[in-house]
């Protein structure tokens, strides 16, 4: 259940979530209809089989999950059928169908195929820190994260969440860290980075599984390359790659945190998930607060 990526948003801490239990059932995921391409809504963080509990709240942390049902209708299948249909019409009439008729035929084909299309189920989890006013969505895709925020906005009626941004150049800060400037307390360099030329469309250098403070890296810095992604480690609890887009990728929880689970008194899958969420949310908060000051992360207006 541990998140693997974090796309972050800020929201005002003054927002009221006290009615979340009563309004979530109205936004529950419903099965995609026979003539629909997609359906989205909230499902239980504990799985689709759970019908009663549609969120998990632990103190200031709220866990929401958006589920999706998407019809799989490959464009190649539709286009092949469209070509055959148009060929049949051309044989009968002596000329191919025009653009408007071709579009109508394609729409009819999609309408015919949809009820028989396979359905793909997916989910995206989000953790809301109600005390510090940020959402961590478990995806590296900005578009997918915005979909989750949109669902929360529809649920609440109003949810003024904005993508996380910084008042400084993230590339400059990441570059300074790899060049030898002190990192924030508790953070250490990992073994991966991506470096880019300052000019648009310039060279991109990717380094993995190597020490980042070395002569090879120094040479790239000397010619003006800047760090766009940097692997970091928070104590021995969390490793991750921070990008200049402020998306956290390759999030991994390490033995320093996982050892706490082994010593926790949990009985059953549900209790284990509760314990995992409690530890994960605490570590994500610690990471967020650790980065907030040096990166001058944006705040939401209350």
Swiss-Prot record:
Highest taxon of the lineage: Bacteria
A cellular component term, taken from the record's GO annotations: bacterial nucleoid
Localization of this protein: Cytoplasm, Nucleoid
Pfam families registered for this protein in UniProt: RdgC
Single GO molecular function: double-stranded DNA binding
InterPro entries (UniProt xref): RdgC
Keywords in alphabetical order: Cytoplasm, DNA recombination
GO BP terms: DNA recombination; regulation of DNA recombination
Family assignment from sequence similarity: Belongs to the RdgC family.
Stated role: May be involved in recombination.
This protein's name: Recombination-associated protein RdgC
Species: Xylella fastidiosa (strain M12)
